[in-house]
Amino acid sequence: MKAYAKANIFLKLTGFDSRKYHLLESRFILLKDVFDELELVDKESDSKKEFEIISNFKCENNIIQKAYLLLSKRYNNELKELFSKKSLKLTKNIPVCAGLGGGSSDCASFLLLMNETLNLKLNLQELINLSIQLGSDIAFFLSGFHSANVSGCGEIIEEFEDDIPNLKWTFPQISCQTKAVYDEFDRGIFDFQKNNNQAQIYKKLSTKELLQNFKNKELNDLFTPCATLYPKMKSYLQEDFFLSGSGSSVFKVDR
């Protein structure tokens, strides 16, 4: 099963919820050319792990592990039986700490794979309700939408009929830590009401219109704090690249 990456075309921070989590308004688009892959494979006879992930990257504290534990509360017997014979193979292609939602997409694909393999018969809303307990971007990947306006803490998804130009991607070898970038944003001067007003305009426009008519700093509130924390990102800000998420992946319209 393929776990596709996403890009944020705009990302405006508009306040905090009761937990002090950031509220956002954003346009997410699915990137069908950038994906991880998940599959069930036969378990090695000498493996002693109850749930084993075989991967080309370090999996400790992985969000998939958390999804497994959450599902185990309701489907412990089914999961134990399956993973007594199978391991989960995860092939990572999506850059890590790059603003492309790789971990969230992997988690969504794992939930979908378990729903299908074990015939759990969970509908989309039930899957989204589970995902809210795991992470903020997972709901978009569960939806299957190619483009959506996303709000709240990432759990409110509205499909958007979009016009998406070809994008040319650059993946700097810089690991941008999401929490650190958000914390840097919080140290600055911001106007949540202004951000929300801008977002209400942006969410009505196509991706093509947004990238043609607005500056990179206008579209993504995290670009300036990202460049402050990671000075090598400043050149991309100055050269009119657009930033996805909290970085470090950047893009331009491929003209």
Curated annotation (Swiss-Prot):
Enzyme class at the top of the EC tree: transferase
Record family assignment: Belongs to the GHMP kinase family. IspE subfamily.
Molecular function via GO: 4-(cytidine 5'-diphospho)-2-C-methyl-D-erythritol kinase activity; ATP binding
Name of the protein described by the UniProt record: 4-diphosphocytidyl-2-C-methyl-D-erythritol kinase
Active site positions, chain numbering: 6, 137
One Pfam family here: GHMP_kinases_N
Function: Catalyzes the phosphorylation of the position 2 hydroxy group of 4-diphosphocytidyl-2C-methyl-D-erythritol.
